[in-house]
């Protein structure tokens, strides 16, 4: 589970930002929303609010870059365009098998080199104080090299900088570096990142092909989201009833249309009053998106995965988004986690759904981009457990709100039309 994400000079973030999923246990409200293990307390869900083009997506890009780096994939990192530095800095603190770890790296985007990386395990003593034990530190700029495997320490300074240390040495020969790699890769492999505006149906299709308990839970999830649906399944073509011409139709939504797998899509059917119809052609956009996200949600809950969702509320009824969040906040969820961006303020509910530290904002002004939590606002600033947070946000008291001047655009359009009419006369 992710505990903290750190970034500097990455995408929209010029200065240091910290996104934390650490629970404040002084607050006893909604205890089921917190995963508790070995005296570490981690939030199961976090919702991120903010106007368009403020930096919400950039925060997700940072998580994706961390995952890709740890999996030895193309990282896609870009330094902030307003700085002279080419060095992107990223870090993550996470839980794995009941243990807490921290990993940081610096990447020179111009030279395509990893100039710094460090990995440590964090322990808590009997007084609840945290202490880090360094496993690896490679700082090629300051020429500081440390490794818990002494035989590795002597070679760090001469290995290539075009990748992480664990990918440029044979880790099987070094006990701790090998364990470090397994921990980092295992953590990264549990992260799924999806965009509800461009969510692939293929993940659900592949899962629907296999008749097992996971598939049954996905079907129940989809049926419960659509009260009029009798069943949802992957069937043989001869079971699909199409009228003349309907087989040539394609889905309206290009984001849900995968031409090379169109036959798979047609075989994914919904059943209404005993009639099988291709879901991609007949179901609403919202139902199709529910079907697409269903496999990710069920897999996350069943397998303890980390689901990162951009625009969770896109084309989905607010009661369904609340239900999805509630599944992760439920006390029966012992290891899954969800991070999502959202615009729907109906989810900003600290009276029935969220702890204050579960609501985050991304705010942008002329000076920069800021990432902060609702928990950063104190009672003295007018934010208490009984406060109507939605109303506070509507009024702009919490920031991270767009300030559109669309009325000025309308007036300029109107005045332009009048001017054109006058010229014509």
Show the residue positions of the predicted features.
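Electropositive, glycine-dotted interaction segments
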Residues: 106-243
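Conserved ABC ATPase signature
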Residues: 45-50, 248-298, 306, 312-316
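Conserved P-loop NTP-binding catalytic core
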Residues: 39-47, 51, 60-110
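Short alpha-helix of the ABC ATPase nucleotide-binding domain corresponding to the H-loop/switch region
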Residues: 317-322
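Pre-Walker A-like glycine/lysine-rich segment at the N-terminus of P-loop NTPase domains
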Residues: 1-65
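Extended helical coiled-coil dimerization/tether regions that scaffold
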Residues: 8, 199-282, 402-404, 408-425
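P-loop NTPase motor core
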Residues: 84-148, 362, 374-387, 391
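C-terminal lobe/lid and adjacent interdomain/linker elements of RecA-like ASCE P-loop ATPase modules
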Residues: 1-4, 303, 323-425
């Amino acid at each position: 589970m992710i505990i903290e994400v750190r970034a500097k000079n990455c995408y929209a973030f010029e200065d240091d930002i910290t996104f934390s999923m650490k629970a404040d246990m002084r607050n006893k409200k909604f205890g089921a929303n917190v995963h508790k293990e070995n005296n570490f307390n981690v939030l199961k869900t976090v919702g991120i609010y903010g106007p368009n083009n403020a930096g919400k997506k950039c925060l997700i890009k940072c998580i994706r870059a961390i995952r890709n780096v740890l999996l030895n994939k193309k990282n896609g990192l870009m330094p902030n365009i307003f700085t002279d530095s080419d060095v992107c800095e990223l870090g993550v603190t996470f839980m794995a098998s009941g243990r807490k770890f921290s990993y940081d790296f610096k990447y020179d985007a111009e030279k395509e080199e990893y100039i710094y990386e460090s990995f440590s395990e964090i322990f808590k003593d009997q007084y609840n104080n945290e202490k880090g034990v360094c496993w690896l530190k490679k700082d090629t700029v300051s020429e500081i090299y440390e490794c818990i495997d002494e035989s590795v320490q002597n070679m760090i300074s001469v290995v290539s900088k075009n990748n992480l240390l664990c990918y440029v040495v044979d880790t099987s020969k070094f006990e701790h570096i090998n364990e470090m790699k397994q921990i980092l890769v295992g953590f990264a492999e549990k992260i799924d990142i999806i965009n509800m505006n461009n969510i692939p149906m293929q993940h659900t299709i592949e899962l629907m092909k296999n008749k097992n308990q996971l598939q049954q839970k996905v079907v129940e999830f989809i049926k419960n989201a659509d009260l009029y649906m009798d069943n949802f399944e992957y069937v043989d073509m001869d079971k699909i009833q199409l009228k003349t011409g309907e087989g040539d139709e394609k889905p309206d939504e290009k984001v849900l249309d995968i031409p090379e797998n169109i036959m798979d899509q047609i075989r994914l059917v919904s059943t209404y009053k005993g009639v099988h119809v291709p879901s991609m052609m007949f179901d609403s956009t919202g139902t199709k998106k529910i079907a697409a996200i269903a496999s990710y949600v069920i897999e996350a809950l069943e397998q303890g995965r980390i689901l990162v969702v951009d625009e969770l509320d896109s084309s989905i009824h607010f009661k369904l988004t609340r239900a999805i969040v509630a599944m992760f906040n439920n006390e029966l969820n012992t290891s899954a986690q969800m991070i999502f961006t959202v615009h729907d303020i109906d989810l900003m509910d600290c009276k029935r759904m969220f702890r204050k530290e579960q609501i985050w904002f991304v705010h942008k002004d002329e000076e920069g981009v800021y990432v902060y939590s609702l928990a950063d606002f104190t009672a003295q600033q007018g934010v208490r457990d009984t406060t109507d947070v939605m109303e506070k946000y509507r009024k702009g008291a919490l920031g991270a709100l767009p300030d559109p001047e669309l009325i000025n655009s309308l007036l300029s359009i109107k005045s332009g039309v009048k001017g054109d009419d006058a010229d014509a006369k």
